[in-house]
A protein has these predicted regions:
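Short, charged/polar low-complexity linear motifs in solvent-exposed/disordered segments
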Residues: 41-42, 54-56, 69, 82-84
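Short aromatic-glycine-(Arg/Gly/Cys) micro-motifs in beta-strand/loop hairpins
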Residues: 24-53
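Generic hydrophobic, helix-prone segments enriched in Leu/Val/Ile
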Residues: 11-12, 26, 37, 70
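Broad hydrophobic/π-residue packing in well-ordered secondary structure
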Residues: 33-35, 57, 79
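Short, mixed-charge low-complexity intrinsically disordered segments
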Residues: 2, 9, 20-29, 64, ...
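Negatively charged, low-complexity tracts enriched in Asp/Glu with abundant Ser/Thr
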Residues: 1-21, 46-49, 58, 84
Length: 84
């Protein structure tokens, strides 16, 4: 569990894979007065995850829209996206 999820309420997690390899994990956490999307990105040829962000939004609706657009883009690029 991420540090943010320990103090907020985790809304959802989306895990994208391509050719069986993890590409990214997106996690939305609601803090009541804001919502944060955390990202772990797994670059090709690297064992280590990169953690851009976090991305802070006014509410869960905005955070969900952001993740929805990211998921649609990942699917367009040939990734399989799963809810966790």
């Amino acid at each position: 569990m991420s540090p943010a999820a320990q103090t907020g309420r985790e809304l959802f997690v989306r895990h994208a894979k391509k050719d069986g390899r993890s590409v990214t994990v997106l996690r939305a956490v609601d803090f009541g007065d804001s919502c944060v999307v955390e990202a772990e990105v797994f670059p090709a040829g690297s064992q280590d995850a990169v953690r851009p962000g976090p991305y802070t939004f006014a509410d869960a609706v905005q955070a969900t829209q952001f993740v929805t657009e990211a998921v649609e883009s990942l699917m367009y690029l040939g990734c399989d996206v799963f809810a966790e």
